[in-house]
Amino acid sequence: MSFPRPANTPWLVPYLTVRDASAAIAFYRNAFGFGVQDEVHDHGRPIHVEMTYQGQLMLMFAPEGAFGSTAKAPAGAGFECPQNFHLYCDDVDTVYQHALDQGAASIMAPHDAFWGERYAAVRDPDGYRWGLACRPATA
């Protein structure tokens, strides 16, 4: 029996549309610490990107217009993104600040949430919302 997905690949991976793939790579790398696993180019520009976090494939994306698509990033289409990504990280406050430094907009400043996690939220330059969370250190 064959394994239906590549090793170290989740069963579900978001595939986003971004305005500029090179800019998105820089944002996700510098804001969240993601790494590039695969990058396909056309005429010197990335048209398909796969990014990892903590050793797992986290997301894939293509720029607007790639492969003949008419899809737009939320910021490019002028609408509020209906989904929210929930990213666990080692230090919410630091990742939140890195995201702001890279051009994200604050949705919610870091705080101790009622459900027991340290939590913050940002909107990335393409309009996607990211919740940043970590569990409190145990004494």
Residue ranges and their predicted role:
Residues 126:
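C-terminal catalytic core of tyrosine-transesterase DNA break-rejoin enzymes
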Residues 1-15, 25-90, 94-123, 133-139:
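Vicinal oxygen chelate
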Residues 18-20:
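Conserved beta-strand-loop-alpha-helix junction that forms the acyl-donor binding cleft
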